[in-house]
Structure formats: C-alpha cells, structure tokens
C-alpha cells in the first residue's frame, strides 16, 4: 500500500479541487492511502468517506506570497510542512502540493532531503508535444543559476526518469540551446555539451532549439533553471493564447465559422487533449529521497487526480530507490 501525503490547502482552488481529485484517485486506485493535511472542517465538506483516507488537522498554511525558506522555518504546523515531515518520518511515501512552489522546493530540500551525490535536484515536468509523445524537461526553476556539472546531472536524472517511469528504453537527451551546432551557446552550454557528449549512461543527441522541443526533438530536454522556467511559461502562455484566439474566432466569425467548428469538433477536441499538460501530472523535484511533486497552482480535480496517478507510478517503479543506488549504492533512503 502506497501512502501519499497531500497538502489540502495549497493552490488557487483548495481545498475543493484537491479533495475532489483525491476522491477520484481513491475510487480508481485500491493500493493507495491518502493523508490530507489542512482544515478538517473545510476538507470534510468535499471528502467522500473512505477507509483509506485520513485527515491531519491544522489551521496553519503557507500563502502564495510567503517567503519560501522563512515560511518553512516559521510555520512548522503548515499543511505543506507537515506533509513533508510525514515523508521524512516515513509515515508517508510521497508528498503532493499545489501551493507555494518555492516553499515546496525548500521543504523538499530541507525536510525530505536530497540524495547523496545529487548536487542540485531539478524541477522536472512531463510536457505535451504536437506528436502526441510527451517529453521531460528540467530544470524548470528550482535553481536560477546552474553550472555545467548541474546540467550534466539533470541529463542523468531526466534520462533515468524517462526510462524507469515513462518506459522509454533509450531516451533521447537534448541540451536546450540557441542552435543545434556544437559550437553554439555561451560558455555554460559549451561546457555542458562536452560533459554530456562524454556521458556513456545517456543517449545524448546534441543541442536542441526551443522551437523544436514541441515537435518531438528529444525525450528529455535539459536546461538551466532560469531558461527552463522561461520556456515553460512561454509554452503555457502560447497554448492558452492560441485556444483563446481560436475560440474567439469561432464565436465572432458568424455562421460559417460555427459550422466549420462543428464539423471539426472531434479534431479540435483531440488537439486539446493532446496538448493538455495536466494529464501528465505535476512537476517532480527529482533528486530527493522521496517523491515531492508540485501541482500547478490553478489545478482542478482532474489535474490533482493525474498527479496522484503519477506519484503512484513513481512508487510502483521504485524510481527513487533505483536513483539512490545509481548515485550512491551504499546509501539507504531515509
């Protein structure tokens, strides 16, 4: 039985969306138990009674505008912190939150702890592509500044996840750069390119450009945290803007536009489903001693359900235990 700690108070739509997502997951997966951390009375308004769910009451929560590290240290009874503490104490196997990203990263690093040998855990998300084959990308903002050694480790981490969790036998790893030639990029990218070229444990295919990653150029895309976060937000903004523009064109385009949309209804629905990033789950702070996963702040119940499904897969495959062995065979997860 997998025990998953869930911060019920984090995110724009908490606790309703969080609890409703938990209800869906419990109904489908019989091998999970959920610990909900937060305001018990508010949680019970949406919770369907189940013997595999428990509530740990707390009135304290971390707000979106709280300074991450200070919040973790001062708000010891916050729902997010208690969830991370449960993982540290082995009362839970993983923790999920849609709350303050920086605070969750801090809780992951300072409470759960990183795997020995991993210099900087990376924030990684599985992204949709136009081909229908998702790709993993990291770092998405856990670290604003990185060295070439960090990017080297991100490539190993991302490849490991793609292989063991997503089932890709030989993941193609690409380095995000401003050109595909090996001579492109600044000193960071050039040094990282050399390190990745010499890494025998990964299938490094060279540099990839931002315009190529949505077209299936690589299974794993490696970037420094600043660049990765900027690209992620550009992708999200472009997707939302495209759908909004398309909807406006249909609604304001008269009878012909509406008729065309009706005829293309199934195609448009399929396109929307292909580009729905929520179905891939949340962003993993990979390189820690247990799964710490961030849902989007605006997550609905569907996104929460898929994140729990993702965490269940991580626990089923024992990817963290395997990662510990890969980086330091002598260390035990604790």
UniProtKB/Swiss-Prot annotation:
Entry similarity comment: Belongs to the PlsX family.
GO CC terms of this entry: cytoplasm
Record-linked SUPFAM superfamilies: Isocitrate/Isopropylmalate dehydrogenase-like (SSF53659)
Presence of the UniProt keyword Nucleus in the record: no
Listed GO biological process terms: fatty acid biosynthetic process; phospholipid biosynthetic process
Encoding gene, per UniProt annotation: plsX
Predominant place of localization: cytoplasm
Compartments it resides in: Cytoplasm
Associated pathway: Lipid metabolism; phospholipid metabolism
NCBIfam families hit by this protein: plsX
UniProt name for this protein: Phosphate acyltransferase
UniProt-listed PANTHER family: FATTY ACID/PHOSPHOLIPID SYNTHESIS PROTEIN PLSX, PHOSPHATE ACYLTRANSFERASE
Function: Catalyzes the reversible formation of acyl-phosphate (acyl-PO(4)) from acyl-[acyl-carrier-protein] (acyl-ACP). This enzyme utilizes acyl-ACP as fatty acyl donor, but not acyl-CoA.
Superkingdom: Bacteria
Keywords: Cytoplasm, Lipid biosynthesis, Lipid metabolism, Phospholipid biosynthesis, Phospholipid metabolism, Transferase
Top-rank EC class of the record's enzyme: transferase
Gene Ontology MF terms in the entry: phosphate:acyl-[acyl carrier protein] acyltransferase activity
Reaction it catalyzes: a fatty acyl-[ACP] + phosphate = an acyl phosphate + holo-[ACP]
Subunit record text: Homodimer. Probably interacts with PlsY.
EC numbers on record: 2.3.1.274
Pfam families given in the database record: FA_synthesis
